[in-house]
Amino acid sequence: MAPSSAQGLELLHGYLNLFTPRTGDVSFMRLVSGYVLATFVAGIGALLLWTLTTVFYRLYLHPLRRYPGPKLWAISRLPYIRSTVKGTIVHDFHRLHKQYGSVVRIAPDELSYSTPEATKVIYQSSPELHKDPMHLPPFHNGTPGILAAEEQHHRRYRRLLAYGFSDRGMRAQQPLIQRHIDLLVKRLSENSGKGSLDIVEWYNWCTFDIIGDLAFGESFGCLEESKTHEWIASIAGNVKAIPIINAIRRFKLDWVIPLIAPKKLLKMRQRNAQFTENKVDQRLSHGADRGDLWDGVMDPKGTKGGMSRQEMISNGSAIVLAGSETSSTLLSGCTWLLLQNPDVLAKLKEHVRGSFTDQSEIDLISVGKLDYMAAVLDEALRLYPPVPMQSNRIVNPGGADIAGQYVPAGTTVAVQQYAACRSSDNFRRPDEFLPQRWLEDPEFANDRRATSQPFSVGPRNCIGRQLAHAEMRLILAKILWHFDLELDAPKMGPRDWLSEQGVWILWDKSPLWVRLMPRTLEKSG
Protein backbone atom coordinates (compact mmCIF):
# COMPACT_ATOMS: atom_id res chain seq x y z
CA MET A 1 0.00 0.00 0.00
CA ALA A 2 1.41 3.46 -1.00
CA PRO A 3 2.59 5.62 1.93
CA SER A 4 0.55 8.67 2.83
CA SER A 5 1.90 12.22 2.41
CA ALA A 6 2.52 12.48 6.16
CA GLN A 7 4.50 9.24 6.14
CA GLY A 8 6.56 10.45 3.16
CA LEU A 9 7.48 13.70 4.91
CA GLU A 10 8.48 11.74 7.99
CA LEU A 11 10.76 9.46 5.94
CA LEU A 12 12.36 12.44 4.19
CA HIS A 13 12.94 14.16 7.53
CA GLY A 14 14.62 11.05 8.93
CA TYR A 15 16.84 10.69 5.83
CA LEU A 16 18.03 14.29 6.01
CA ASN A 17 18.79 13.89 9.70
CA LEU A 18 21.43 11.33 8.75
CA PHE A 19 23.59 14.24 7.46
CA THR A 20 22.98 16.60 10.33
CA PRO A 21 25.69 16.29 12.99
CA ARG A 22 24.54 15.86 16.52
CA THR A 23 25.88 18.07 19.28
CA GLY A 24 28.22 15.33 20.48
CA ASP A 25 29.59 14.80 16.96
CA VAL A 26 30.35 18.50 16.56
CA SER A 27 32.29 18.53 19.81
CA PHE A 28 34.26 15.45 18.78
CA MET A 29 35.11 16.91 15.37
CA ARG A 30 36.26 20.14 16.95
CA LEU A 31 38.45 18.16 19.32
CA VAL A 32 40.03 16.18 16.46
CA SER A 33 40.54 19.30 14.34
CA GLY A 34 42.16 21.07 17.26
CA TYR A 35 44.46 18.11 17.86
CA VAL A 36 45.49 17.94 14.19
CA LEU A 37 46.11 21.68 14.08
CA ALA A 38 48.12 21.57 17.29
CA THR A 39 50.19 18.65 15.96
CA PHE A 40 50.83 20.50 12.71
CA VAL A 41 51.86 23.68 14.51
CA ALA A 42 54.07 21.67 16.87
CA GLY A 43 55.69 19.93 13.89
CA ILE A 44 56.37 23.24 12.17
CA GLY A 45 57.76 24.61 15.40
CA ALA A 46 59.99 21.58 15.91
CA LEU A 47 61.24 21.83 12.32
CA LEU A 48 61.92 25.53 12.72
CA LEU A 49 63.72 24.91 16.02
CA TRP A 50 65.81 22.11 14.46
CA THR A 51 66.67 24.35 11.48
CA LEU A 52 67.70 27.28 13.67
CA THR A 53 69.69 25.00 15.97
CA THR A 54 71.44 23.36 13.01
CA VAL A 55 72.24 26.72 11.43
CA PHE A 56 73.59 28.06 14.72
CA TYR A 57 75.68 24.93 15.33
CA ARG A 58 77.18 24.81 11.83
CA LEU A 59 78.06 28.50 11.84
CA TYR A 60 79.26 28.98 15.42
CA LEU A 61 79.98 25.61 17.08
CA HIS A 62 80.98 23.22 14.28
CA PRO A 63 84.68 22.13 14.20
CA LEU A 64 84.99 23.72 10.73
CA ARG A 65 83.47 27.04 11.81
CA ARG A 66 86.76 28.96 11.48
CA TYR A 67 87.33 27.99 7.86
CA PRO A 68 86.28 30.69 5.36
CA GLY A 69 83.54 30.22 2.80
CA PRO A 70 80.01 31.27 1.85
CA LYS A 71 77.56 30.97 4.75
CA LEU A 72 74.89 29.16 2.75
CA TRP A 73 77.37 26.46 1.71
CA ALA A 74 78.49 26.06 5.33
CA ILE A 75 74.89 25.72 6.52
CA SER A 76 73.58 23.22 3.98
CA ARG A 77 74.74 20.73 1.36
CA LEU A 78 72.04 22.02 -1.04
CA PRO A 79 74.12 24.78 -2.73
CA TYR A 80 76.83 22.21 -3.47
CA ILE A 81 74.29 19.77 -4.89
CA ARG A 82 72.69 22.49 -7.00
CA SER A 83 76.09 23.41 -8.41
CA THR A 84 76.96 19.82 -9.32
CA VAL A 85 73.59 19.16 -10.95
CA LYS A 86 73.85 22.40 -12.97
CA GLY A 87 77.37 21.49 -14.09
CA THR A 88 78.91 24.71 -12.76
CA ILE A 89 80.76 23.17 -9.82
CA VAL A 90 84.31 23.60 -11.20
CA HIS A 91 83.78 27.25 -12.11
CA ASP A 92 82.03 27.88 -8.77
CA PHE A 93 85.01 26.42 -6.87
CA HIS A 94 87.37 28.61 -8.90
CA ARG A 95 85.30 31.69 -8.02
CA LEU A 96 85.10 30.75 -4.33
CA HIS A 97 88.86 30.19 -4.06
CA LYS A 98 89.54 33.57 -5.67
CA GLN A 99 87.22 35.14 -3.10
CA TYR A 100 88.11 33.23 0.08
CA GLY A 101 91.63 31.92 -0.44
CA SER A 102 93.44 28.59 -0.66
CA VAL A 103 91.04 26.68 1.59
CA VAL A 104 87.27 27.05 1.44
CA ARG A 105 84.47 25.40 3.37
CA ILE A 106 82.16 24.23 0.57
CA ALA A 107 79.71 22.17 2.66
CA PRO A 108 78.99 21.65 6.36
CA ASP A 109 81.58 18.85 6.52
CA GLU A 110 83.78 19.45 3.45
CA LEU A 111 86.85 21.55 2.62
CA SER A 112 88.29 22.44 -0.78
CA TYR A 113 91.99 23.25 -1.27
CA SER A 114 93.92 25.03 -4.02
CA THR A 115 97.41 24.77 -2.55
CA PRO A 116 100.01 22.06 -3.28
CA GLU A 117 100.81 21.76 0.45
CA ALA A 118 97.51 19.92 0.87
CA THR A 119 98.27 17.33 -1.80
CA LYS A 120 100.73 15.18 0.15
CA VAL A 121 98.52 14.73 3.21
CA ILE A 122 95.31 14.14 1.27
CA TYR A 123 96.60 11.77 -1.42
CA GLN A 124 99.90 10.36 -0.14
CA SER A 125 99.29 9.63 3.54
CA SER A 126 99.90 6.23 5.08
CA PRO A 127 97.45 4.86 6.01
CA GLU A 128 95.45 6.20 3.09
CA LEU A 129 92.60 8.62 3.47
CA HIS A 130 89.61 6.67 2.18
CA LYS A 131 87.63 7.90 -0.79
CA ASP A 132 84.28 9.47 0.08
CA PRO A 133 81.65 6.96 -1.16
CA MET A 134 79.14 9.78 -1.65
CA HIS A 135 81.32 11.13 -4.46
CA LEU A 136 81.68 7.78 -6.23
CA PRO A 137 79.38 6.48 -8.96
CA PRO A 138 77.23 3.41 -8.25
CA PHE A 139 78.42 0.06 -9.60
CA HIS A 140 76.01 -1.74 -11.91
CA ASN A 141 77.20 -5.22 -10.85
CA GLY A 142 77.94 -4.37 -7.21
CA THR A 143 81.70 -4.88 -7.65
CA PRO A 144 83.89 -1.75 -7.42
CA GLY A 145 86.53 -1.37 -10.12
CA ILE A 146 90.00 0.09 -9.77
CA LEU A 147 88.69 3.65 -9.39
CA ALA A 148 86.70 2.88 -6.24
CA ALA A 149 88.02 -0.38 -4.78
CA GLU A 150 89.20 -0.65 -1.18
CA GLU A 151 92.94 -0.56 -0.59
CA GLN A 152 93.67 -4.30 -0.70
CA HIS A 153 91.70 -4.85 -3.92
CA HIS A 154 93.09 -1.66 -5.46
CA ARG A 155 96.66 -2.83 -4.86
CA ARG A 156 95.85 -6.21 -6.41
CA TYR A 157 94.24 -4.60 -9.46
CA ARG A 158 97.24 -2.33 -10.01
CA ARG A 159 99.66 -5.22 -9.68
CA LEU A 160 97.76 -7.28 -12.24
CA LEU A 161 97.44 -4.40 -14.71
CA ALA A 162 100.91 -2.95 -14.14
CA TYR A 163 102.65 -4.57 -17.10
CA GLY A 164 99.99 -3.51 -19.61
CA PHE A 165 100.43 0.14 -18.62
CA SER A 166 104.23 0.09 -18.23
CA ASP A 167 106.81 1.46 -20.70
CA ARG A 168 107.60 -2.07 -21.77
CA GLY A 169 103.94 -2.85 -22.22
CA MET A 170 103.42 0.33 -24.24
CA ARG A 171 106.23 -0.66 -26.60
CA ALA A 172 104.71 -4.09 -27.08
CA GLN A 173 101.38 -2.45 -27.90
CA GLN A 174 102.92 0.18 -30.20
CA PRO A 175 101.88 -1.52 -33.48
CA LEU A 176 98.26 -1.63 -32.31
CA ILE A 177 98.26 2.02 -31.18
CA GLN A 178 100.09 3.16 -34.31
CA ARG A 179 97.61 1.37 -36.56
CA HIS A 180 94.64 3.28 -35.13
CA ILE A 181 96.42 6.64 -35.27
CA ASP A 182 97.43 6.03 -38.90
CA LEU A 183 93.78 5.26 -39.65
CA LEU A 184 92.81 8.54 -37.98
CA VAL A 185 95.17 10.44 -40.29
CA LYS A 186 93.80 8.58 -43.30
CA ARG A 187 90.17 9.36 -42.41
CA LEU A 188 90.98 13.01 -41.72
CA SER A 189 92.70 13.24 -45.11
CA GLU A 190 89.66 11.74 -46.82
CA ASN A 191 87.29 14.19 -45.13
CA SER A 192 89.44 17.32 -45.07
CA GLY A 193 88.10 18.56 -48.40
CA LYS A 194 84.49 18.46 -47.22
CA GLY A 195 84.71 21.54 -45.02
CA SER A 196 85.48 21.88 -41.34
CA LEU A 197 85.40 18.83 -39.06
CA ASP A 198 84.40 18.45 -35.43
CA ILE A 199 87.85 17.51 -34.17
CA VAL A 200 86.41 16.52 -30.76
CA GLU A 201 84.49 13.71 -32.41
CA TRP A 202 87.53 12.42 -34.30
CA TYR A 203 89.72 12.43 -31.21
CA ASN A 204 87.01 10.50 -29.35
CA TRP A 205 86.75 7.91 -32.09
CA CYS A 206 90.50 7.32 -32.18
CA THR A 207 91.07 7.04 -28.43
CA PHE A 208 88.02 4.83 -27.91
CA ASP A 209 89.14 2.50 -30.69
CA ILE A 210 92.61 2.23 -29.14
CA ILE A 211 91.41 1.51 -25.62
CA GLY A 212 88.72 -0.84 -26.92
CA ASP A 213 91.43 -2.88 -28.61
CA LEU A 214 93.57 -2.87 -25.48
CA ALA A 215 90.76 -3.58 -23.02
CA PHE A 216 88.44 -5.86 -25.01
CA GLY A 217 90.63 -7.32 -27.74
CA GLU A 218 88.91 -5.40 -30.55
CA SER A 219 88.18 -1.78 -31.36
CA PHE A 220 84.77 -0.12 -31.37
CA GLY A 221 85.09 0.43 -35.13
CA CYS A 222 84.47 4.17 -34.85
CA LEU A 223 87.19 5.18 -37.30
CA GLU A 224 86.31 2.38 -39.73
CA GLU A 225 82.67 3.42 -39.79
CA SER A 226 83.29 7.14 -39.17
CA LYS A 227 80.55 7.16 -36.56
CA THR A 228 80.12 6.92 -32.80
CA HIS A 229 79.47 3.48 -31.33
CA GLU A 230 76.24 3.17 -29.34
CA TRP A 231 78.12 2.31 -26.14
CA ILE A 232 80.20 5.48 -26.43
CA ALA A 233 77.22 7.66 -27.32
CA SER A 234 75.47 6.62 -24.13
CA ILE A 235 78.37 7.52 -21.84
CA ALA A 236 77.52 11.23 -21.75
CA GLY A 237 73.98 10.52 -20.57
CA ASN A 238 75.16 8.07 -17.93
CA VAL A 239 77.87 10.38 -16.62
CA LYS A 240 75.52 13.36 -16.45
CA ALA A 241 73.15 11.31 -14.30
CA ILE A 242 75.80 10.55 -11.67
CA PRO A 243 75.58 13.89 -9.77
CA ILE A 244 71.80 13.51 -9.56
CA ILE A 245 72.06 9.90 -8.41
CA ASN A 246 74.68 10.81 -5.80
CA ALA A 247 72.49 13.66 -4.51
CA ILE A 248 69.62 11.22 -4.03
CA ARG A 249 71.93 8.70 -2.35
CA ARG A 250 73.17 11.40 0.03
CA PHE A 251 69.62 11.77 1.38
CA LYS A 252 69.33 7.96 1.66
CA LEU A 253 66.57 7.82 -0.95
CA ASP A 254 68.16 5.19 -3.19
CA TRP A 255 64.81 3.44 -3.61
CA VAL A 256 63.49 6.51 -5.45
CA ILE A 257 66.03 6.24 -8.30
CA PRO A 258 64.28 3.45 -10.27
CA LEU A 259 60.96 5.29 -9.87
CA ILE A 260 62.06 8.68 -11.21
CA ALA A 261 64.86 7.77 -13.62
CA PRO A 262 63.83 8.00 -17.30
CA LYS A 263 63.14 4.56 -18.72
CA LYS A 264 65.41 5.40 -21.65
CA LEU A 265 68.32 5.97 -19.26
CA LEU A 266 67.66 2.73 -17.34
CA LYS A 267 67.52 0.75 -20.59
CA MET A 268 70.70 2.44 -21.77
CA ARG A 269 72.53 1.49 -18.57
CA GLN A 270 71.31 -2.08 -18.91
CA ARG A 271 72.48 -2.27 -22.53
CA ASN A 272 75.86 -0.86 -21.55
CA ALA A 273 76.24 -3.40 -18.77
CA GLN A 274 75.31 -6.25 -21.10
CA PHE A 275 77.69 -4.98 -23.77
CA THR A 276 80.59 -4.92 -21.30
CA GLU A 277 79.75 -8.40 -20.03
CA ASN A 278 79.66 -9.76 -23.58
CA LYS A 279 83.02 -8.17 -24.38
CA VAL A 280 84.64 -9.62 -21.25
CA ASP A 281 83.20 -13.08 -21.95
CA GLN A 282 84.50 -12.86 -25.50
CA ARG A 283 87.96 -11.91 -24.20
CA LEU A 284 87.91 -14.75 -21.66
CA SER A 285 87.16 -17.23 -24.43
CA HIS A 286 90.40 -16.27 -26.23
CA GLY A 287 92.64 -17.10 -23.27
CA ALA A 288 95.79 -15.28 -22.17
CA ASP A 289 98.87 -14.03 -24.04
CA ARG A 290 97.20 -11.80 -26.58
CA GLY A 291 99.48 -8.84 -25.85
CA ASP A 292 96.75 -6.67 -24.34
CA LEU A 293 95.93 -5.38 -20.86
CA TRP A 294 94.44 -8.67 -19.67
CA ASP A 295 97.52 -10.88 -20.00
CA GLY A 296 98.21 -12.30 -16.55
CA VAL A 297 94.96 -10.85 -15.21
CA MET A 298 92.36 -13.42 -16.07
CA ASP A 299 91.06 -15.67 -13.29
CA PRO A 300 87.31 -16.16 -13.94
CA LYS A 301 86.66 -17.84 -10.59
CA GLY A 302 88.80 -15.38 -8.62
CA THR A 303 90.73 -18.17 -6.88
CA LYS A 304 94.31 -17.65 -8.14
CA GLY A 305 94.93 -14.03 -7.21
CA GLY A 306 93.80 -12.76 -10.60
CA MET A 307 90.54 -11.00 -11.41
CA SER A 308 87.18 -12.69 -11.30
CA ARG A 309 84.74 -12.23 -14.17
CA GLN A 310 82.79 -9.60 -12.22
CA GLU A 311 86.00 -7.71 -11.42
CA MET A 312 87.01 -7.78 -15.08
CA ILE A 313 83.62 -6.34 -16.04
CA SER A 314 83.92 -3.47 -13.55
CA ASN A 315 87.52 -2.74 -14.47
CA GLY A 316 86.85 -3.05 -18.19
CA SER A 317 84.24 -0.29 -18.02
CA ALA A 318 86.49 1.93 -15.88
CA ILE A 319 89.54 1.44 -18.10
CA VAL A 320 87.64 2.19 -21.31
CA LEU A 321 86.10 5.37 -19.94
CA ALA A 322 89.23 6.69 -18.21
CA GLY A 323 91.60 5.53 -20.95
CA SER A 324 89.71 7.26 -23.73
CA GLU A 325 88.24 10.39 -22.15
CA THR A 326 91.53 11.57 -20.66
CA SER A 327 93.37 11.64 -23.98
CA SER A 328 90.53 12.84 -26.21
CA THR A 329 89.56 15.62 -23.81
CA LEU A 330 93.10 16.93 -23.46
CA LEU A 331 93.71 16.77 -27.23
CA SER A 332 90.51 18.73 -27.82
CA GLY A 333 91.45 21.37 -25.25
CA CYS A 334 95.02 21.56 -26.50
CA THR A 335 93.82 22.06 -30.08
CA TRP A 336 91.56 24.92 -28.97
CA LEU A 337 94.39 26.56 -27.01
CA LEU A 338 96.79 26.22 -29.95
CA LEU A 339 94.27 27.78 -32.33
CA GLN A 340 93.78 30.66 -29.89
CA ASN A 341 97.56 31.15 -29.70
CA PRO A 342 98.86 30.99 -33.29
CA ASP A 343 102.45 31.80 -32.30
CA VAL A 344 102.55 28.70 -30.10
CA LEU A 345 100.92 26.62 -32.84
CA ALA A 346 103.47 27.80 -35.40
CA LYS A 347 106.38 27.03 -33.07
CA LEU A 348 105.05 23.57 -32.22
CA LYS A 349 104.41 22.77 -35.88
CA GLU A 350 107.97 23.81 -36.75
CA HIS A 351 109.25 21.77 -33.80
CA VAL A 352 107.50 18.61 -35.02
CA ARG A 353 108.29 19.00 -38.70
CA GLY A 354 111.90 19.94 -38.02
CA SER A 355 112.47 16.88 -35.81
CA PHE A 356 111.69 14.27 -38.47
CA THR A 357 112.51 13.72 -42.12
CA ASP A 358 109.69 11.26 -42.74
CA GLN A 359 106.43 10.28 -41.04
CA SER A 360 107.75 6.75 -40.50
CA GLU A 361 110.13 8.17 -37.88
CA ILE A 362 107.22 9.35 -35.72
CA ASP A 363 106.55 6.69 -33.07
CA LEU A 364 105.98 6.36 -29.33
CA ILE A 365 109.69 6.54 -28.56
CA SER A 366 110.66 9.43 -30.83
CA VAL A 367 107.79 11.71 -29.78
CA GLY A 368 108.90 11.29 -26.18
CA LYS A 369 111.98 13.36 -27.06
CA LEU A 370 110.00 16.42 -28.24
CA ASP A 371 110.59 18.79 -25.34
CA TYR A 372 108.48 21.67 -26.64
CA MET A 373 105.55 19.34 -27.32
CA ALA A 374 105.84 18.07 -23.75
CA ALA A 375 105.70 21.67 -22.53
CA VAL A 376 102.64 22.41 -24.69
CA LEU A 377 100.81 19.36 -23.35
CA ASP A 378 101.79 20.15 -19.74
CA GLU A 379 100.44 23.67 -20.16
CA ALA A 380 97.23 22.37 -21.71
CA LEU A 381 96.86 19.93 -18.81
CA ARG A 382 97.27 22.82 -16.38
CA LEU A 383 94.60 25.00 -17.97
CA TYR A 384 92.25 22.18 -18.97
CA PRO A 385 92.74 19.11 -16.74
CA PRO A 386 90.73 16.22 -18.28
CA VAL A 387 89.45 15.28 -14.82
CA PRO A 388 88.87 18.76 -13.36
CA MET A 389 87.90 17.57 -9.87
CA GLN A 390 90.25 15.38 -7.84
CA SER A 391 88.78 12.54 -5.82
CA ASN A 392 87.43 13.44 -2.38
CA ARG A 393 88.94 11.80 0.69
CA ILE A 394 87.74 11.46 4.28
CA VAL A 395 90.10 12.43 7.11
CA ASN A 396 91.05 9.45 9.27
CA PRO A 397 90.27 9.12 13.01
CA GLY A 398 92.48 11.45 15.00
CA GLY A 399 92.28 14.21 12.43
CA ALA A 400 95.07 15.59 10.25
CA ASP A 401 97.19 18.68 9.76
CA ILE A 402 96.51 19.91 6.22
CA ALA A 403 98.25 23.01 4.85
CA GLY A 404 99.18 24.07 8.38
CA GLN A 405 95.70 23.79 9.92
CA TYR A 406 94.03 21.04 11.93
CA VAL A 407 91.17 19.22 10.19
CA PRO A 408 88.92 16.97 12.33
CA ALA A 409 88.23 13.33 11.55
CA GLY A 410 85.36 12.62 9.19
CA THR A 411 85.85 15.80 7.15
CA THR A 412 85.77 15.37 3.37
CA VAL A 413 88.75 17.05 1.68
CA ALA A 414 90.08 17.48 -1.86
CA VAL A 415 92.50 19.58 -3.91
CA GLN A 416 90.67 21.18 -6.82
CA GLN A 417 92.91 21.02 -9.89
CA TYR A 418 91.12 23.63 -11.97
CA ALA A 419 91.08 26.22 -9.20
CA ALA A 420 94.61 25.44 -8.03
CA CYS A 421 96.15 25.62 -11.49
CA ARG A 422 94.48 28.95 -12.26
CA SER A 423 95.48 30.57 -8.98
CA SER A 424 97.94 33.48 -9.04
CA ASP A 425 99.31 32.10 -5.77
CA ASN A 426 100.66 29.13 -7.73
CA PHE A 427 101.35 30.43 -11.23
CA ARG A 428 102.40 33.71 -12.80
CA ARG A 429 99.88 34.89 -15.42
CA PRO A 430 97.74 31.85 -14.55
CA ASP A 431 95.05 32.23 -17.21
CA GLU A 432 97.47 32.49 -20.14
CA PHE A 433 98.65 29.61 -22.35
CA LEU A 434 102.43 29.85 -21.94
CA PRO A 435 104.30 26.56 -22.55
CA GLN A 436 107.64 28.24 -21.81
CA ARG A 437 106.80 28.11 -18.10
CA TRP A 438 107.69 24.38 -18.28
CA LEU A 439 111.05 25.04 -20.00
CA GLU A 440 112.96 26.83 -17.21
CA ASP A 441 112.01 30.31 -18.41
CA PRO A 442 113.26 32.69 -15.66
CA GLU A 443 110.02 34.69 -15.79
CA PHE A 444 108.24 31.66 -14.31
CA ALA A 445 110.95 30.54 -11.89
CA ASN A 446 108.60 30.98 -8.93
CA ASP A 447 105.76 28.96 -10.43
CA ARG A 448 104.69 26.12 -8.16
CA ARG A 449 104.61 23.56 -10.93
CA ALA A 450 103.97 20.66 -8.54
CA THR A 451 100.46 22.09 -8.16
CA SER A 452 99.49 20.67 -11.55
CA GLN A 453 98.73 16.98 -10.96
CA PRO A 454 96.18 16.09 -13.68
CA PHE A 455 96.73 12.37 -13.12
CA SER A 456 96.71 12.69 -9.31
CA VAL A 457 99.52 11.50 -7.04
CA GLY A 458 100.11 8.77 -4.50
CA PRO A 459 99.17 5.09 -4.58
CA ARG A 460 95.91 5.86 -6.40
CA ASN A 461 97.35 8.00 -9.17
CA CYS A 462 96.18 7.22 -12.70
CA ILE A 463 97.64 3.89 -13.78
CA GLY A 464 97.11 4.84 -17.43
CA ARG A 465 99.01 8.13 -17.38
CA GLN A 466 101.84 6.74 -19.55
CA LEU A 467 99.34 5.51 -22.12
CA ALA A 468 97.62 8.89 -22.09
CA HIS A 469 100.90 10.78 -22.59
CA ALA A 470 101.96 8.41 -25.37
CA GLU A 471 98.63 8.74 -27.18
CA MET A 472 98.51 12.51 -26.88
CA ARG A 473 102.06 13.03 -28.13
CA LEU A 474 101.74 10.61 -31.02
CA ILE A 475 98.32 11.81 -32.20
CA LEU A 476 99.26 15.49 -32.00
CA ALA A 477 102.60 14.92 -33.74
CA LYS A 478 100.96 12.97 -36.56
CA ILE A 479 98.28 15.61 -37.11
CA LEU A 480 100.75 18.51 -37.12
CA TRP A 481 103.04 16.61 -39.48
CA HIS A 482 100.25 15.99 -42.00
CA PHE A 483 97.96 19.02 -41.63
CA ASP A 484 97.76 22.75 -41.16
CA LEU A 485 94.95 23.67 -38.76
CA GLU A 486 92.56 26.60 -38.80
CA LEU A 487 89.54 27.39 -36.64
CA ASP A 488 86.24 27.68 -38.52
CA ALA A 489 85.40 31.03 -36.92
CA PRO A 490 82.03 31.60 -38.67
CA LYS A 491 80.81 28.18 -37.52
CA MET A 492 82.15 28.57 -33.98
CA GLY A 493 80.86 32.10 -33.49
CA PRO A 494 82.12 34.41 -30.74
CA ARG A 495 81.83 31.87 -27.93
CA ASP A 496 84.73 30.65 -25.83
CA TRP A 497 84.71 26.89 -26.42
CA LEU A 498 86.64 26.06 -23.25
CA SER A 499 85.18 28.37 -20.62
CA GLU A 500 81.55 27.73 -21.61
CA GLN A 501 81.73 24.01 -20.80
CA GLY A 502 79.86 22.48 -17.91
CA VAL A 503 81.24 19.66 -15.79
CA TRP A 504 79.33 16.53 -14.86
CA ILE A 505 82.26 14.47 -13.54
CA LEU A 506 83.80 15.05 -17.01
CA TRP A 507 83.84 18.10 -19.27
CA ASP A 508 80.73 18.42 -21.43
CA LYS A 509 82.53 19.20 -24.69
CA SER A 510 80.69 20.91 -27.53
CA PRO A 511 81.81 20.52 -31.18
CA LEU A 512 85.10 22.17 -32.10
CA TRP A 513 85.00 22.97 -35.82
CA VAL A 514 88.45 22.95 -37.40
CA ARG A 515 89.61 23.10 -41.01
CA LEU A 516 92.44 20.68 -41.80
CA MET A 517 94.51 21.50 -44.87
CA PRO A 518 96.73 18.58 -45.97
CA ARG A 519 100.38 19.55 -45.95
CA THR A 520 102.15 19.46 -49.30
CA LEU A 521 105.32 17.43 -48.93
CA GLU A 522 108.16 17.73 -51.40
CA LYS A 523 109.05 14.15 -50.73
CA SER A 524 107.68 11.37 -48.60
CA GLY A 525 109.39 8.16 -47.91
Swiss-Prot record:
Q: What is the name of this protein? A: Averantin hydroxylase
Task: Please give the superkingdom of this protein's source.
Answer: Eukaryota
Q: What protein family does this chain belong to? A: Belongs to the cytochrome P450 family.
Catalytic activity entry: (1'S)-averantin + reduced [NADPH--hemoprotein reductase] + O2 = (1'S,5'R)-5'-hydroxyaverantin + oxidized [NADPH--hemoprotein reductase] + H2O; (1'S)-averantin + reduced [NADPH--hemoprotein reductase] + O2 = (1'S,5'S)-5'-hydroxyaverantin + oxidized [NADPH--hemoprotein reductase] + H2O + H(+)
Gene that this sequence comes from: avnA
Query: Recorded E.C. number(s)?
Result: 1.14.14.116
For this protein, the record's Pfam families field holds: p450 (PF00067)
Q: How does it sit in the membrane?
A: Single-pass membrane protein
Cite the annotated pathway. Answer: Mycotoxin biosynthesis
